[in-house]
Amino acid sequence: MTKKNFKPQGQRTVMGFDFGTKSIGIAIGQELTGSASSLKAVKAQDGIPNWDDIAVQVNEWQPDLMVVGLPLNMDGTAQEVTFKAKKFANRLHNHYAIPVETQDERLTTADAKARLFEQGGYKNLGKGKVDNMSAVIILESFFETSYGE
């Protein structure tokens, strides 16, 4: 991806990631509206994604900022996967030269499952769907934290 001119804060397109060791959920959102939509989840092996699959999404959506969910324990302390998520965030920045921030993602999986169940019952709870909905929630949380929406 070539270097681009980034939009000012409040007008950016933001790509969100729900990091996992087997699957990484992806969502795209707009700061202006504070809304987000899920994209296609990417499979990972021990937290390492197929970077070509991520590049397809990055090249299509041209985000100005990326946000990676940071899995923390309920008391706010780090766990093993927290460090892997931070490493993933650093690799995203190194691959695409796009600013990357992290966002607390405590309880997003439970929230994602509840939303998906509400929309379509148990049949709607596939792993990729949960990861993608988690990515949507991570972005929505980022927008709320950043702009108080």
Swiss-Prot record:
Database matches in Pfam families: RuvX
Coiled-coil blocks: none
Transmembrane residue ranges: none
InterPro entries (alphabetical): RNaseH-like_sf, YqgF, YqgF/RNaseH-like_dom, YqgF/RNaseH-like_dom_sf
GO BP, sorted A to Z: rRNA 5'-end processing
Keyword Transport: no
EC number(s) recorded for this UniProt protein: 3.1.-.-
This protein's GO CC annotations: cytosol
Main location: cytoplasm
Keywords tagged on the record: Cytoplasm, Hydrolase, Nuclease, Ribosome biogenesis
GO molecular function: nuclease activity
HAMAP family: Nuclease_YqgF
PANTHER family membership: POLYNUCLEOTIDYL TRANSFERASE, RIBONUCLEASE H-LIKE SUPERFAMILY PROTEIN (PTHR33317:SF4)
Name of the featured protein: Putative pre-16S rRNA nuclease
Species of provenance: Pseudoalteromonas translucida (strain TAC 125)
